[in-house]
Amino acid sequence: RLQACASMDHFWGERKWLDILGITKRDYKAFLQEQRPLSDTSITSLADYLDVSADEIQQGTVDFRAVSTQKGDGDKVLPEPYSIAAFGRLRTTITSFDYIEERLGWRVRADTLRHFRINEAVLSDYMAPTNMRVITDLALYMQTKHNMSDSQLFHMGMHSSVGNRNTLIGAVLSTARDITEAYAIYIDELAKFFENNLRYTITLLREDRCTLEAVSYRYVAEALGVRHLGNKQVCAIRAGMLASVPHYLDQPQASVTEPLCVHRGDSVCRYEIKFPHVASL
C-alpha cells in the first residue's frame, strides 16, 4: 500500500521504489509473498524517503493518506474542470471516497483518485469549494467502472452521516428537538449554506414525512454547459444523504423515494421522505 500511496506502482516508479529499498525485483516479490522480511537497512531507507519512522512502518501505523498527500501523483488543488462555477463544497466528495475505500478497498480509492488526477491533499478540507462535476463524474465512473448499483450509491450517500458526525453538520443536527426539525434545518439552512447549485424547496413537512423538490439554478447549469446539474447517479446519492438525517439523532434511517426526476424528463427532482417510525410500520 505504501508503494501505491507514493505513486510508485508503475514501471518507472517501481524501479525508483526498488532503489530506495536497495533490493532486487526478485527479492521484493519474495517479500510480498511473505517468503522473506525487509532488512532494517531497507526499512530505514524507506522511512527516510517517506518522512515517517521505521517503527511506524514495522507496526503498520503509517498515516497512508498523509503519504499520498506528500508523495502521490495528482494536483494538490482541484483540476480546472472541477473548479469553475464552484458553488458547492467538497464534503460529499470526501465522504464518498471514504465509502469507496470502506466498501471496495484502498486500491480502488487510490486508482480512482489517480483517474481523476486528484491528490489526497485536496480531500483534507470539507469546506473547499468545488462544482457538481466532480461528484457527477465520480458517481458515473463508479457505476460504469466498478458496477456500483443505485442501491450502493444510495448507501454511499448515507455514509455521509458517518463522515459528517464530527463536523458542523453533525453538531447542528444533533441539537434538533426531533426528526421534523432536523429535516427543516438540514434543507432550509445547512443545504443552502453548503451549496448554491440547486434550489431546495420543502413542499410538505409533517411529523411523519417530508416532501422535497430540487431544481438546478439556471446560471450554474449554464456555466457548466448542462441543462440539469448532476445525473441519476447523483440523485441516488442525494436520496441516501436525505435518508441519513435521522442518524444525527441516533435514529434509524428514513425511507426515501424519488417519484420525479429531471434526468427522467420531469421538471423537478422530488423526494418523498417517510420518517423511520412510519417507514417501519
Where are these predicted regions, by residue range?
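Amphipathic interaction/junction segments at domain boundaries or subunit interfaces
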Residues: S124-V234, L260
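DNA major-groove recognition helix of helix-turn-helix/homeodomain DNA-binding modules
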Residues: T41-I57
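A short, Lys/Arg-rich alpha-helix, primarily the initiator
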Residues: R1-K16, I20, T95
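Short amphipathic recognition helices of helix-turn-helix/homeodomain-type DNA-binding modules
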Residues: A54-S83, G157
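Recognition helix of helix-turn-helix/homeodomain-like DNA-binding domains
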Residues: G22-L38
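Residues in the helix-turn-helix
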Residues: K16, D27, E56
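Short terminal or interdomain "cap/linker" segment that borders an active site or interface and mediates
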Residues: S39, Q59, L198-A239, L249-L281
